[in-house]
Amino acid sequence: MEASAAKFIGAGLAAIGMIGSGIGVGNIWANLIATVGRNPSAKANVELYGWIGFAVTEAIALFALVVALMVLFA
């Protein structure tokens, strides 16, 4: 196996972390919408935690992207 092929495989494997992050973000927003649908008065309290959860979960995807790009171009 050539080094370039190994880089592509490694970058693809490192990018797999973005799949889990996408699923997590979907779950966060789905549960936020369901919670506000059940109790609209709780929107102000729940919305902040939804944004914080989104940011933390999305950071994992960004870390996976950085690792994939480092494997590919370094």
Swiss-Prot record:
Record's keyword annotation contains Cell membrane: yes
- Known SUPFAM superfamilies for this protein? F1F0 ATP synthase subunit C
How does it sit in the bilayer? Multi-pass membrane protein
A Gene Ontology cellular-component term: plasma membrane
**Localization per record:** Cell inner membrane
Where is the major localization of this protein? membrane
Q: Pfam families attached here? A: ATP-synt_C
Q: Which UniProt keywords apply?
A: ATP synthesis, Cell inner membrane, Cell membrane, CF(0), Hydrogen ion transport, Ion transport, Lipid-binding, Membrane, Transmembrane, Transmembrane helix, Transport
Transmembrane parts of this sequence:
8-28, 52-72
Q: From the Swiss-Prot or TrEMBL record, what is one GO molecular function term?
A: lipid binding
Site keyed Reversibly protonated during proton transport: positions:
58
What family is this?
Answer: Belongs to the ATPase C chain family.
Tell me the function of this protein.
F(1)F(0) ATP synthase produces ATP from ADP in the presence of a proton or sodium gradient. F-type ATPases consist of two structural domains, F(1) containing the extramembraneous catalytic core and F(0) containing the membrane proton channel, linked together by a central stalk and a peripheral stalk. During catalysis, ATP synthesis in the catalytic domain of F(1) is coupled via a rotary mechanism of the central stalk subunits to proton translocation. Key component of the F(0) channel; it plays a direct role in translocation across the membrane. A homomeric c-ring of between 10-14 subunits forms the central stalk rotor element with the F(1) delta and epsilon subunits.
Assembly and partners are described as: F-type ATPases have 2 components, F(1) - the catalytic core - and F(0) - the membrane proton channel. F(1) has five subunits: alpha(3), beta(3), gamma(1), delta(1), epsilon(1). F(0) has three main subunits: a(1), b(2) and c(10-14). The alpha and beta chains form an alternating ring which encloses part of the gamma chain. F(1) is attached to F(0) by a central stalk formed by the gamma and epsilon chains, while a peripheral stalk is formed by the delta and b chains.
Q: How is this protein named in the record?
A: ATP synthase subunit c
State the encoding gene: atpE
